[in-house]
Amino acid sequence: MLTVENKADIIKKYQKKEGDTGSTEVQIALLSARISDLQSHFDLNKKDHHSRRGLLKMVSRRRRLLEYFKRTNFEGYRQLIADLGLRR
């Protein structure tokens, strides 16, 4: 589960300016953290199909955001995927 402190740390790390919570980088980083938390949840709960659907929705949303970010800011995109450890 993503705690308030973890979420604040992620936002602080990827924000462009003070109070920035909705930029593409922040959204992608938060989704990546939630996705990794859910993946560890599925190691213990293999039959939790309702949460799996939510995971798939988050993955597709992150994929769309990454495609948009790649189109608009390619250098930032390359740095972000390297920083988050995503394979693309």
Curated annotation (Swiss-Prot):
Keyword Ribosomal protein appears in the UniProt entry: yes
Gene3D superfamilies reported for this sequence: 6.10.250.3130, S15/NS1, RNA-binding
Keywords recorded for this protein, A-Z: Ribonucleoprotein, Ribosomal protein, RNA-binding, rRNA-binding
Classification via InterPro entries: Ribosomal_uS15, Ribosomal_uS15_bac-type, uS15_NS1_RNA-bd_sf
An example Gene Ontology CC term for this record: cytosolic small ribosomal subunit
GO MF terms, alphabetically ordered: rRNA binding; structural constituent of ribosome
One GO BP annotation of this record: translation
Domain of life: Bacteria
Stored CDD domains: Ribosomal_S15p_S13e
Assembly information from the UniProt record: Part of the 30S ribosomal subunit. Forms a bridge to the 50S subunit in the 70S ribosome, contacting the 23S rRNA.
Family per record: Belongs to the universal ribosomal protein uS15 family.
Primary role: One of the primary rRNA binding proteins, it binds directly to 16S rRNA where it helps nucleate assembly of the platform of the 30S subunit by binding and bridging several RNA helices of the 16S rRNA. Forms an intersubunit bridge (bridge B4) with the 23S rRNA of the 50S subunit in the ribosome.
Record protein name field: Small ribosomal subunit protein uS15
Species annotation: Dichelobacter nodosus (strain VCS1703A)
